[in-house]
Amino acid sequence: MEKYIMSLDQGTTSSRCIIFNKKGEVVSVAQKEFTQIYPKAGWVEHDPLEIWGKQAGVAGEALNIARISPEQIAGIGITNQRETTVVWNKRTGMPVYNAIVWQCRRTAGYCDELREKGLDKTIKEKTGLMLDAYFSATKIKWILDNVEGARELAEKGDLLFGNIDTWLIWNMTKGKIHVTDYTNASRTMLFNIHELKWDEELLEILDIPKSMLPEVKPSSCVYGETDEILFGVSIPISGDAGDQQAALFGQTCFNAGMAKNTYGTGCFLLMNTGEKAVDSKNGLLTTIAVGIDGKVEYALEGSIFIGGAVIQWLRDELRMVKTAQETEKYATEVEDNNGVYLVPAFVGIGAPYWDSYARGTILGLTRGAKKEHIIRAALESMAYQTHDVLKAMEEDSGIELKALKVDGGACQNNFLMQFQSDILGVEVDRPEVVETTALGAAYLAGLAVGYWKDRNEISQNWAISRSFAPAMEDEKKEKLIKGWHKAVTKAMDWEERE
């Protein structure tokens, strides 16, 4: 009987299930979108019960599509939107409030209060993270302080906290197991990434009872088995990682200096730094890449707020293109950008500049500038921003980038990938299987149950669909980068400070 690995990929807008075979190929995919809840400006919530219902539903659907039985699943891997916070009553299994999503800014004011007390330095030293409303800690505190009766229940030991991975595992095991992995724990702003434990001092500062927190385990191990009510048989749950870390693993970035960029709405860059937690001087996050083989490995992470979103803007607001795919055709119809730069600082600019007062600009316009030049400049902006983050990573880590592995929607744009390679001066590799997030969770699960022997075997599965090699002269490259940096300085400090 042929065996497979099931991957549950619980994202920000949809719940998916992908089944993989031994070669790391996709056998079937099932997907369901779920409701986004916006109670106030800047607030974002999800319904944890809807997420669980949809996730269980797509698991059954993926089995049906693949025409395989639950007995053929050797293990289940979970990957999830990170930081999103669920608090539930362990006696009833019911959430006390909606899940507060990573994008939610409701605790920004409280973060400012902590910053005024000088706690940002303590938090960065212990957790590797910036003090920000993005992470789970202040979201948990908000629920305890604002939901009637929540604090009393928590003090009595009746409330549990979990990110989405923990919530799914708890439900899959019918409340038997309350667990998370090192990668998800490292995004809570409560976990000491050097001592590998929940930090007592941070829990005290935020007034969060330790009894709420899950046990932290490696990303690849058998956490428990699914309750028989789910599939009719018990299946080992054996892999767990946050989405960006899972993508790094799925891209087989197993050695220090290997990096991946996910070109989505924004871009997420992660570089493996091995067993060394590198402290960033350039506003990057230090995070846990994976917990496996009795040790943890670390990564530097940089996020670019506006990546593929600039293409959506060209399509929906400026109506310059009908589809995102058309941008490649227009960009290649002109020889160069004609001196035009587009800085997509629509919501400020992230790593390594960190200026929330920057705003979007188009610079270098002349009478000869055409629509094609603006479209090309928009695509080029993704490559320039990636260049800036990767240079910061190299500087922080002292590790030279060897090649960049890519995934996400915009990695299908050949013009962008070639330009990315030219600007970085390194090879850019696009894999055959672009479902790298789900694949990473599958690999973690499969390793724990012996479905794959070791990381070497997995590395052999990784196949290049297309490789892009740098072909631009250094002088031209330097001139373009210089122009980009000049454009960024013009975009900065634009919005009036209150």
From Swiss-Prot:
Top-level taxon in the UniProt lineage: Bacteria
Family of the protein in this entry: Belongs to the FGGY kinase family.
HAMAP family in UniProt: Glycerol_kin (MF_00186)
Function: Key enzyme in the regulation of glycerol uptake and metabolism. Catalyzes the phosphorylation of glycerol to yield sn-glycerol 3-phosphate.
A molecular function (GO) term: ATP binding
Keywords, ordered alphabetically: ATP-binding, Glycerol metabolism, Kinase, Nucleotide-binding, Transferase
Residues at which sn-glycerol 3-phosphate binds: T12, R82, E83, Y134, D243
PANTHER family found in the cross-reference section: GLYCEROL KINASE, SUGAR KINASE
Regulation of its activity: Activated by phosphorylation and inhibited by fructose 1,6-bisphosphate (FBP).
Natural source organism: Clostridium botulinum (strain Okra / Type B1)
Positions annotated to bind glycerol: R82, E83, Y134, D243, Q244
Pathway: Polyol metabolism; glycerol degradation via glycerol kinase pathway; sn-glycerol 3-phosphate from glycerol: step 1/1
Pfam family, one: FGGY_C
Protein name: Glycerol kinase
Subunit structure: Homotetramer and homodimer (in equilibrium).
